[in-house]
């Protein structure tokens, strides 16, 4: 065979293979489009399957175009039973760092929300950080004027604990300028307060769906805890205030089951003032340490039973824990009455440990700077000044802010008690710093069986930002 014949033969074979390959593809496409859809599904190219994994159950919506699958993951309920939460608090010798979001540092160059009032709450499988956004991002023109508490742009959103409040991982929860949230073991319940000052409305969401509402009953800035509500055996409790911030107001405790309000109680507290309660479950009851924005530099204490009966008074300890406050040496303490004559205040917390109490407070007596937590012997039941432990979380050279409580459920820890935890907000920007905005980050600590060294886990952002220099 001469060279020309070889070339012709090789070319003919190659062309034949190409034609055969094309014919096979045509047959494959014809079978896929015309034959397979007719096999019991009326020509539909879409299908839904359920696949069970060890860690959870996911519904996968599978859309098929010939050889391509597009899969959307749809979340299922985390559990089929309510959390008990009737255990006692674990004894804590100190508090170890759980998370720190560094949101403002990241937000100088990242897409991070302007926020205030962050708090933490836990389900049987995870803890989430909730926060009230201002409908704007750090280092953006819309951050101007965000020192304002209430606006139509504020929303409650959440991320997994430790994540910054960024636009890519945040989950919308409610329209709100005041809020609370908690998990009953099956689904998240969130309560977002929004609307005009005189006719604000609290919208209850359960599993992401609006299920009930509470209208303002006193017409004066209906508001709630700015920290976790408390669920016990499927029933969730929270506290609301309606009325003046600097004199007698009205207070109510609410109970809901699966997002529907099933009870409420008026809290009679003449001469006392309750706002922004920090609550946690303990031995089958809800224990709250709140803010007196009227006169007291000691904190109100509210203990709620499952039937909504309650005991209300003040934290007995002979050390004040609100800000501003006077000298420790000049404070005597009271279990029943407000002490001191310092108006205003800041959200705070405390934990009962038998008759003792862990109480958090700013280190500064006059401003929201620094943060420490003290353990006072018999401070829950007596006017004791006996400080038996102290731990510094933020030093007094750095700004702090609100603080609040939550617990780790036994489903998370596998212990037979509820781990006490707290968070500290670190406010940056206005009114203390020369910026056009106000925002915050947070540090979260949880109780452990060991003493923890003092340190300062402060915010650390370098201000001003570029937007502040324009």
From Swiss-Prot:
It catalyses: Hydrolysis of alpha-(2->3)-, alpha-(2->6)-, alpha-(2->8)- glycosidic linkages of terminal sialic acid residues in oligosaccharides, glycoproteins, glycolipids, colominic acid and synthetic substrates. GO terms for cellular component: host cell plasma membrane; membrane; virion membrane. The active site is at residues 149, 402. SUPFAM superfamilies: Sialidases. Keywords: Calcium, Disulfide bond, Glycoprotein, Glycosidase, Host cell membrane, Host membrane, Hydrolase, Membrane, Metal-binding, Signal-anchor, Transmembrane, Transmembrane helix, Virion. GO terms for biological process: carbohydrate metabolic process; viral budding from plasma membrane. Belongs to the glycosyl hydrolase 34 family. This is Neuraminidase. It comes from Influenza A virus (strain A/Mallard/Edmonton/220/1990 H3N8).
């Amino acid at each position: 065979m001469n060279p020309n014949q070889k070339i012709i033969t090789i070319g003919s074979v190659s062309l034949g293979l190409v034609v055969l390959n094309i014919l096979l593809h045509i047959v494959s496409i014809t079978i896929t489009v015309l034959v397979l859809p007719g096999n019991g599904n009326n020509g539909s190219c879409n299908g839904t399957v359920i696949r069970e994994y060890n860690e959870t159950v996911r519904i996968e919506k599978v859309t098929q175009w010939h050889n391509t699958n597009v899969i959307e993951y749809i979340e299922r309920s985390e559990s089929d039973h309510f959390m008990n939460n009737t255990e006692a608090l674990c004894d804590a010798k100190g508090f170890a760092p759980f998370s720190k979001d560094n949101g403002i540092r990241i937000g100088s160059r990242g897409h991070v929300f302007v926020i205030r009032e962050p708090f933490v709450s836990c389900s049987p499988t995870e803890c989430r950080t909730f926060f009230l956004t201002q409908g704007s991002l750090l280092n953006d023109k819309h951050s101007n004027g965000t020192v304002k508490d209430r606006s139509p742009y504020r929303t409650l959103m959440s991320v997994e604990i430790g994540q910054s409040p960024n636009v890519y991982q945040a989950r919308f929860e409610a329209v709100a300028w005041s809020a609370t949230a908690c998990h009953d073991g099956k689904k998240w319940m969130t309560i977002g307060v929004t609307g005009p000052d005189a006719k604000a409305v609290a919208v209850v969401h359960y599993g992401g769906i609006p299920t009930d509402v509470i209208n303002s009953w006193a017409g004066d800035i209906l508001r709630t805890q700015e920290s976790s509500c408390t669920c016990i055996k499927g029933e969730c409790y929270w506290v609301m205030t309606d009325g003046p911030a600097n004199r007698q107001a009205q207070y109510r405790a609410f109970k809901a089951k699966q997002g529907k309000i099933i009870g409420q109680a008026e809290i009679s507290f003449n001469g006392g003032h309750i706002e922004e309660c920090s609550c946690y479950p303990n031995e089958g009851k809800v224990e709250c340490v709140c803010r007196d924005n009227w006169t007291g530099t000691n904190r109100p204490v509210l203990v709620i039973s499952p039937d909504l009966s309650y005991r209300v008074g003040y934290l007995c300890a002979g050390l004040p824990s609100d800000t501003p406050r006077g000298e420790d040496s000049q404070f005597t303490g009271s279990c029943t009455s407000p002490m001191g004559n310092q108006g205003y205040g800041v959200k705070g917390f405390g934990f009962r440990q038998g008759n003792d109490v862990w109480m958090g407070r700013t280190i500064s007596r006059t401003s929201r700077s620094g943060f420490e937590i003290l353990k006072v012997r018999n401070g829950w039941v007596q006017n004791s000044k006996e400080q038996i432990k102290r731990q510094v979380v933020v030093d007094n050279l750095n700004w702090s802010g609100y603080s609040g409580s939550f617990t780790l459920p036994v489903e998370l820890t596998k212990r037979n008690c509820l781990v006490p935890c707290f968070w500290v907000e670190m406010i940056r920007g206005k009114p203390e710093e020369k910026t056009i905005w106000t925002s915050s980050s947070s540090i979260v600590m949880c109780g452990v069986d060991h003493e923890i060294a003092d340190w300062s886990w402060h915010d650390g952002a370098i201000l001003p930002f570029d937007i502040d220099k324009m």
